[in-house]
Amino acid sequence: MKFVLDYKITTILLIGLILRIISIYFYRDIEIVNEWGIIVKNLEENNILSVHSVQGVPVPNIFMPPLYPLFLYSIKIFFSNTDIFLWIIYFTQLLFALISIYLAYKIFLEFFSENISFIGSLFFATFPLNVYAVSQISSIVLQMFLFNLFILSFLKLFRNMDHKFLFLFSISSGLLMLIRGEYFIFVLFSLIYLYFKNKQITKVLTISVLVLLIISPYLIRNFNIFNVITITKSSGYNLLKGNHPNTKVEGTPMFLSVGKIVPEVNEKLQKLNENGPNVKYDLMQDKILLDQAIEFIKENPTKYILLYFKKFFSFMFLDINSSYPNYYSPFHIIPKLFLSITTLIGLILSFRFKLNIINYVALFYIANIGLFSFFFILPRYSLSLLLIQVILSLFL
C-alpha cells in the first residue's frame, strides 16, 4: 500500500486538520470520566483492568473491551500530568483521524474515479460528527481508523489474496474485536464472503489463525478468570439498557445506576454486592440483567418489536425523540439526513444478487444496523458506518 499524496488528498487532509484543531480547542473533554476514567484509575492505582468495584474492591473486567482503555493507560504511563496526558491523547487521535481520511480516499478509489473519490473524501473529512469525535475521550476515532484499514485490506483481498493485505486484514480484524466485541460477527461474515469469492481455504484459515493469535492473550485472561471464552460479556447490560419499560431509542444512561433505572433488578444486584468481591462479579451481574431484559421482552413482545424498528429507523435516518445535546443542531441533522437519504438510494441502485464487493458493503451496512437495533442507538454509532454510507451514497 503506497502512501502517495497528491494535491487533492493533501488539500482534504489540510482542511481536516484545521477543522479538528478547532474542534479540539473549543470542545475537548477536560477530564476522563465515567468508565474510561475508572478503568485507567484502577490500572494506575491497583494494576487491574476493572470498571466495577464491590465494597470498595475493584473486580476483574469483562464488561468493557480492553483496547481503548489500554491505549489510554499506555499514554498515562509516560505522561502523569493530566493536561499533558489529555493533549497527547488528542494529538494521537488527530493523527488517527487524518490517516483514516487518507485510507477513506484510497478505499473510494477502489470504486470510483479520482474526482468522485475526492468528493467522497471531502465529505468524510468534514462530516461534523466526525470532526467533533476527535475532541472526545471515546474509542470511536481509533475504531474508525482500524475499520478503514479493515475495509481497505478486505477490498484488496477480495480482488487478489495478497499476503501483505492478508496480514493487514488480520491485524485490523483482531484489534477491532478488542475495541468492539461484536466485530467478531462481522469478521466471521467477511471471512465467509472471502471464501466463497476466492475459494482459497488455506488463506482464509491463515487469517483466522492470525486473528486468533492477536486476541488469544485476552481470551486466555478471561478464561482463567471467568471460565468463559469471550472478549466481552455485556449483552445483558446493553439489551436491558435498550429494552425496559421506560427506555427509548437511544437507551437509558444507567452506568453504575442500573438498580435505580430498572428497580426490578435492584434486589438481586444488592444481594450480589452483599456477597462481597467476587472475581466473576461482572459475569454474574450481566446474567441478572440479561434475564431481566428477556423477561421484559417476553411480557410485551409487540412493544419491543416496534421499538426495534424505531431504532432501525433512527439509525438509518434520525431519532425523532433524541435527548442528546445539539442532536437537532443544523450542523448535525442536515448532513445526517442528507447522507441517510443518499445512502438508501445508493443502496437500492447498487444492490445486485451477486457475490460482488458492493453487495458486501450493502450487507455489512444492513447487518450492522440490524444488530445494533436489538440494543440501543447512540448518535456516535452512525460514525462507525460513515465510510460505508459514503460509499453507497457515491453510487448515485
Spans of features found by a protein language model:
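Transmembrane-helix motifs of polytopic, lipid-linked glycan transferases
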Residues: T10, F91-F112, L149, S153, ...
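Transmembrane-helix signature of polytopic, membrane-embedded enzymes
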Residues: I101-T126, M144-F145, K164, N356-N359
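Membrane-proximal stem/loop segments at transmembrane-domain junctions that anchor or position
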Residues: F226-K310
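Short helix- or helix-capping micro-motifs
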Residues: G16-L19, S117-P128, L152, S173-M177
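Loop-to-helix entry region of an early transmembrane alpha helix in multi-pass inner-membrane enzymes
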Residues: P66, L70, F78-I99, S121, ...
